Amino acid sequence: MNVEIERNFGEQPIAGIMEGHGLKAQDLVSISTEQLTYKMVYRACKGRRLTLNVKSKIRDALNKSIGEEYSMEELFTY
């Protein structure tokens, strides 16, 4: 069972949204009430495969920081 799992999906829409609002990874980490790390945010922007739980934490922190409601489909292409 040597099934190759796609891990890199290229830059994600969340990177453009964060840039448009002038946000950095530090902003999401500091506003999050959940355990969120810089590495998780960087991986999300770069397009590394993340678990649903991590994507939810990032979405919640982003929505809280800008006061808008983005869905998973708007932030991630996978």
Q: How would you label these PLM feature ranges?
A:
Residues 27, 38-40, 74:
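Residues in the helix-turn-helix
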Residues 34-50:
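Recognition helix of helix-turn-helix/homeodomain-like DNA-binding domains
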Residues 2-3, 69-78:
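Short amphipathic recognition helices of helix-turn-helix/homeodomain-type DNA-binding modules
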Residues 1-29:
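A short, Lys/Arg-rich alpha-helix, primarily the initiator
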Residues 30, 43, 77:
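Phosphate-coordinating loops and pocket residues in cytosolic domains that bind phosphorylated ligands
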Residues 53-70:
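DNA major-groove recognition helix of helix-turn-helix/homeodomain DNA-binding modules
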